Design a protein with these regions (language model features):
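Alpha-helical transmembrane segments of multipass membrane proteins
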Residues: 18, 50-54, 101, 105, ...
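Alpha-helical transmembrane segments and their immediate juxtamembrane interface regions
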Residues: 2-7, 117-155
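Alpha-helical transmembrane segments and their membrane-interface junctions
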Residues: 20-25, 44-45, 94-116
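Short membrane-interface loop/juxtamembrane segments of multi-pass integral membrane proteins
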Residues: 73-91
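Loop-to-transmembrane-helix entry motif
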Residues: 8, 12, 90-101
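Long, highly hydrophobic alpha-helical transmembrane signal-anchor segments
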Residues: 1-53, 125, 133
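Transmembrane helix-loop junctions in multipass membrane proteins, especially transporters and channels
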Residues: 26-30, 63-67, 114-118, 153-154
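Membrane-water interface of transmembrane alpha-helices
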Residues: 53-73
Length: 155
């Protein structure tokens, strides 16, 4: 169960930092000049690179300490038949929750500009809204996998 929680938390942090880097680079730090487009990176990009290195090293250390953890398979690593069944159950739950979340996010994304602009006069950046919505969908997928795996394991 430790490897599932480790992977879920690690992947969640990875996705959230990656989304923050995308927003930082393409929205807040882009400059359009006559010479072309110029991108600069900031502190979030540095934090992301440091986290990526630390997470990869942590995964490598875990694969050396826990023989049932495969670096290539990650959270799908299984020591026995019970863990394979848990992974299968969690994959089904994760798939269903991700698909439902995608439909909800698509609905929000399509109607967000029309719903908020006229009554509230709020100008939203659709790129940022899209990145945030799809990041949330991915996080829901990771969380639902971890919760379903732990639920199945403790049942």
């Amino acid at each position: 169960m430790k490897k599932i929680i480790f992977e879920a938390i690690g992947n969640l942090i990875f996705v959230l930092l990656f989304a923050a880097v995308i927003i930082e680079v393409f929205v807040t730090n882009v400059k359009y000049t006559t010479d072309g487009t110029q991108f600069t990176t900031g502190t979030i990009s540095s934090i992301f690179l440091i986290y990526l290195i630390v997470f990869l090293i942590s995964r490598l250390v875990l694969s050396k300490k826990d023989k049932s953890y495969s670096l290539k398979q990650g959270e799908f690593s299984a020591a026995d038949e019970r863990e394979k069944n848990n992974a299968y159950f969690a994959s089904i739950v994760s798939y269903k929750s991700t698909i439902i979340s995608l439909f909800i996010a698509l609905g929000i994304f399509v109607f967000i500009n029309n719903l908020l602009n006229p009554p509230f006069d709020i100008e939203l950046n659709l790129f940022v809204s899209g990145v945030v919505l799809f990041t949330l969908v991915i996080c829901i997928g990771f969380l639902s996998y971890a919760i379903a795996w732990v639920f199945q394991d403790t049942r």
